[in-house]
């Protein structure tokens, strides 16, 4: 009997050893850990940089040698994430996403999300950023924003759920643990919810933000939903620098850390022909980069509840170049002269009238549009200053008396003589879009007059701060001077 048991045990041990030898190291390691699926153009070096490790550690964890290639679709164990398990899935941060909402959507935990993405705080995520989540299953769920004043019982009644279901599904301590502006996820099979990003808002989109460019915001909202919002930019304070230079020697370069203003611009939302809501907003030329803008959205439901969302959005740097240093009369760069004039102009172009009067691309304002003496956005130095100034529009060639025409249909809302801009005309094209025509020798329109695209409105001159006759064209979008080149090319609706 003992001999039979001994032989049986030996046979079983040999069998297990044989099975273990047949298993590949990849099969053994697949039992636990965090795994990354190799993508096209990946290398061990790029993967190790993403996850703050080294190629050698990845090779060791996956039983690879220096000569072993990796292939798209292959799963690699990523070292350094002890205690976590699952497959890494790359996501692009969208409007409305937070670490907590992403955790709930993927049935994970916020600390794991922070850990695999090496985040220092929830505010560190930026719309458009590529991050990773740990995927364990593909259980369907539905997004539900929590409005102010909502209780667990109200949520349960609206969604047809047991009051404890939402709490358990979202790792809450109980039905009472709801916080306004939070985002919950509910089992898709047990809810009639729509998966709105905000209450009554099912889709949001914001084009890339670039210095001096025009951003396009769109939202798909229910008829009874009220949506409002704003964008805040960190903008270098030129006026403060002008005052500082009165007591310090001028230098030919930008200071390393110029003063910054937090400029907030409301989104001027209007209905689009397709039923969506839309807004156009200029990005200030001197927005600090690298850096982010802050988007704030508030949705109010028909019953009076509201939900607010704040997110950071990356602002791209645009290289507009430099102008040669210039010499002008001191009063033309004196803040006592320039600041009141700027205040007048920006107050004039701040309102957003409800009627959209332009249609498609705007038209050049002169008969020789390809003849330009200066372009938008170039940094400038006046009278030995730092390069803290910048050119706000396009300068078109011309002789005194050459015709100036309107770039689009609109209403004349300002005519007059200004110290820096000379004889100036400003036209309102609706929805917060304005055009400005400066340095004219003669203004040929009057306040309140309706004009058509291509209509003569004045004559080129050399009034104001100029070195010779020309037309300066400004384009304002959302109270910000923007690069009109894209508008002339018809890139905006």
What is each stretch, according to the model?
Residues 161, 172, 178-181, 186, ...:
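Conserved, short, structured surface segments that act as functional micro-motifs
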Residues 62-63, 117-118, 170-171, 415, ...:
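Short histidine-centered loop motifs in beta-beta connectors
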Residues 187-312, 317:
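Cationic-aromatic interfacial patches
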Residues 28-52, 76, 80-107, 129, ...:
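Primarily a LysM-type cell-wall glycan-binding module
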Residues 403-412, 445-460:
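Short, well-structured beta-strand-loop connectors
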Residues 11-22:
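Bacterial N-terminal signal peptides
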Residues 74, 406-444, 469, 474:
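Zn2+-dependent peptidoglycan hydrolase active-site motif and core
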Residues 309, 314-421:
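Surface-exposed, glycine-biased beta-strand/turn segments
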């Amino acid at each position: 009997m003992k001999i039979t048991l001994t032989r049986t045990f030996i046979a079983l041990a040999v069998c297990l050893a044989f099975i273990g030898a047949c298993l590949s190291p990849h099969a053994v390691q697949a039992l636990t850990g965090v795994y990354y699926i190799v993508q096209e153009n990946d290398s061990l070096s790029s993967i190790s940089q993403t996850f703050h490790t080294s190629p050698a550690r990845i090779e060791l964890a996956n039983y690879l040698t220096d000569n072993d290639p990796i292939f798209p679709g292959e799963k690699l164990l990523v070292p350094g994430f002890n205690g976590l398990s699952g497959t890494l899935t790359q996501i692009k941060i969208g409007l409305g996403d937070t670490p907590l909402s992403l955790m709930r959507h993927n049935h994970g935990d916020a600390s794991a999300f922070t850990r695999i993405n090496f985040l220092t705080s929830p505010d560190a995520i930026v719309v458009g950023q590529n991050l990773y989540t740990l995927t364990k299953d593909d259980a369907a769920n539905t997004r539900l924003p929590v409005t102010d004043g909502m209780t667990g019982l109200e949520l349960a009644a609206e969604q047809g759920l047991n009051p404890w279901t939402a709490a358990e599904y979202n790792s809450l301590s109980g039905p009472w643990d709801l916080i306004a502006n939070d985002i919950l996820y509910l089992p898709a099979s047990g809810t009639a919810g729509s998966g709105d990003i905000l209450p009554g808002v099912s889709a949001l989109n914001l084009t890339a933000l670039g210095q001096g460019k025009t951003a396009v915001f769109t939202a798909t909202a229910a008829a009874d939903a009220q949506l409002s919002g704003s964008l805040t930019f960190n903008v270098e304070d030129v006026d403060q620098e002008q005052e500082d230079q009165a007591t310090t020697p001028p230098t030919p370069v930008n200071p390393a850390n110029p003063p910054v203003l937090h400029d907030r611009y409301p989104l001027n939302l209007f209905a689009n022909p397709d039923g969506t809501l839309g807004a156009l907003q200029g990005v200030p030329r001197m927005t600090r980069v690298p850096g982010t803008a802050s988007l704030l959205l508030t949705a109010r439901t028909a019953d009076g509840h509201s939900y607010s969302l704040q997110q950071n959005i990356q602002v791209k740097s645009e290289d507009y170049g430099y102008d040669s240093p210039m010499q002008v009369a001191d009063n033309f760069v004196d803040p006592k002269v320039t600041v009141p004039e700027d205040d007048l102009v920006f107050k004039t172009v701040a309102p957003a009238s409800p009627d959209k009067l332009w249609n498609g691309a705007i038209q050049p304002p002169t008969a020789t549009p390809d003849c330009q003496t200066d372009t938008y956005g170039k940094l400038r130095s006046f009278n030995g200053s730092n390069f803290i100034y910048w050119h706000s529009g396009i300068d078109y060639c011309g002789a005194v008396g050459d015709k100036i025409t309107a770039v689009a249909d609109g209403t004349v809302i300002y005519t007059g003589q200004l110290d820096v801009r000379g004889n100036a005309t400003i036209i309102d094209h609706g929805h917060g879009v304005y055009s400005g025509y400066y340095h004219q020798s003669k203004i040929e329109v009057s306040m309140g007059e309706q004009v058509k695209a291509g209509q003569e409105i004045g004559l080129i001159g050399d009034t104001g701060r100029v070195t010779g006759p020309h037309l300066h064209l400004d384009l304002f979008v959302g109270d910000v001077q923007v690069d009109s080149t894209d508008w002339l090319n018809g890139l905006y609706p």
